[in-house]
Amino acid sequence: MAVGHVDVLVGVPTLNNAGTIRPVVKAVHQAFSRYFPRDRTVLINSDGGSEDGTPNLVRNASADDTETVTVLHSLRTIHRISTPYHGVPGKGNALRQIMTAADLTQARAVAVLNADVTGITPEGVASLIRPVRDQQYDYVAPVYRRHPLDGPLVTQLIRPLMRAAYGWQVREPVAPEFACSSRFIAHCLEQDVWDSELGRVGIDLWVTGEALAGGFRCCQTGISPHPTMLSRTPFGELFEQVVSSAFTCLERHSAYWLPRHGSDALALAGPLPTSTIEAPATDGSRLTEAFARDLDNLRYVLESILGEQTLASLLRMAETQGSHLRYPDELWVSTVYEFLLAYRRGVMRREHIVQALAPLYLGRTGSFLRQFSSAHETEVEEALESLCLHFERAKPDLVQRWNHLGALH
């Protein structure tokens, strides 16, 4: 199908997503019809070889295939294209194909959606696209309305680490949805990340880091409610992918973040969502029990990663507090930064370093959940902000030690 120049392009990477793709496609169709009726629009499905009929569902879908809706009819044809990508299955190759298509069609605004995000709405799709299309932003990150106890891998580790390093307050640095400009796409396509492990499993984090470190005009916009995402990746594998990607991004972008101090708020291109969200039903006991059980087994490994004072504090905490432990902010920050430095030094196989961090992360998360499971959302948000500030205050020591490692190489 010849499409030519387009105004708005939405890309959806897929691999065996027949069970979830239909509401995503429907939301895109409705966003095109309601909010961009005069624009040339195209939906690109970049498929990694699905065997469940996902591409056919995309090609045959329509905006009202599950219910009758009243929309402003588009004045232009909405194009749908489903095409396989080549190479190792993974979002990196799919995103590369989507960006290549956007570059070829000179798309003014591009949004990327996850095929598992079944709760995405037409308004959410439009909220991502508008800042690029109408306000000339280069990169748009979503802000979900979700309870602050939800998503602890982001709130306890990735968000404060990325904020302290890059100096920008991005609430969802690992979000599978984002929007970007043709200028940012041209930049991304020139980078050497696509055939790497980071490109295969950590492309979402890399895109965020590249936008911040590349000096592009970035913003955030509200999406409500938090889309339901059905992850099919086991926790251990997901943790290793996300943390390894974050550490690798910090290596790649060190020239940008090492001189930065503090953090700045990222511009808001739209109102933040305000709907009420229930807290996750957990008190963290199971996580702290796993920490207390596994820490001693990891002692030999941790001796090669952590400083003596940090390791001694962890062992003492596990011995005296057990499953009722309180993992202080300062100790958690020291833990994460020392793991990052060990990752850079290569004290052992990098996957083993990251795997050793997982039980400590569970202990920190369990401790936080136990402490704040009954707290008001405002109190939890204040505690998360305090954690971010601890990461920022400890950054000068990290920078000094990082630079010392560079001098030794």
Regions found by a protein language model. Give the residues of each.
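Cell-envelope/extracellular polymer assembly enzymes that use nucleotide-activated donors
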Residues: D7-L9, V42
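A conserved acidic beta->alpha catalytic loop
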Residues: D47-N56
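Short beta-strand-to-loop acidic/aromatic patch adjacent to the donor-nucleotide binding site
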Residues: A107-T118
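Conserved donor-nucleotide/metal-binding helix-loop-beta segment in metal-dependent transferases, i.e.
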Residues: I120-V143
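Terminal low-complexity segments of carbohydrate-biosynthetic enzymes
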Residues: S244-H409
